[in-house]
Amino acid sequence: VMNLWPGVRLRVMEGWDEDGHHSEESLHYEGRAVDITTSDRDRNKYAMLARLAVEAGF
């Protein structure tokens, strides 16, 4: 993220969920999912952010 968008930070919104905010099959209940965004909340970056996550092994 910092190499692609200088000054923009990765934000982890949620990882583990035990309060039932996600669907029954959600991996959040196993700690195997994460909701992320960028500090500028620019939705145009989300597709590339997803690609970066896959390249990083997520």
Swiss-Prot record:
Gene Ontology CC annotations of this record: extracellular space; plasma membrane
Binding site for Ca(2+) 2: E14, D17, D19
Molecular function in Gene Ontology: calcium ion binding; patched binding; peptidase activity
Entry PTM: The C-terminal domain displays an autoproteolysis activity and a cholesterol transferase activity. Both activities result in the cleavage of the full-length protein and covalent attachment of a cholesterol moiety to the C-terminal of the newly generated N-terminal fragment (N-product). The N-product is the active species in both local and long-range signaling, whereas the C-product has no signaling activity.
UniProt: Ca(2+) 1 binding residues: E14
Source organism superkingdom: Eukaryota
Annotated residues for binding of Zn(2+): H28, D35
GO annotation, biological process: cell fate specification; cell-cell signaling; proteolysis; regulation of gene expression; smoothened signaling pathway
Keyword Hydrolase in record: yes
InterPro entries registered for this protein in UniProt: Hedgehog, Hedgehog_sig/DD-Pept_Zn-bd_sf, Hedgehog_Signaling, Hedgehog_signalling_dom
Cellular compartment(s): Cell membrane; Secreted, Extracellular space
Gene3D superfamilies hit by this protein: 3.30.1380.10
Disulfide bridge partners, by residue number: none
Keyword entries, A-Z: Autocatalytic cleavage, Calcium, Cell membrane, Developmental protein, Hydrolase, Lipoprotein, Membrane, Metal-binding, Palmitate, Protease, Secreted, Zinc
Role summary: Intercellular signal essential for a variety of patterning events during development.
Domain text: The indian hedgehog protein N-product binds calcium and zinc ions; this stabilizes the protein fold and is essential for protein-protein interactions mediated by this domain.
Protein family: Belongs to the hedgehog family.
Record protein name field: Indian hedgehog protein
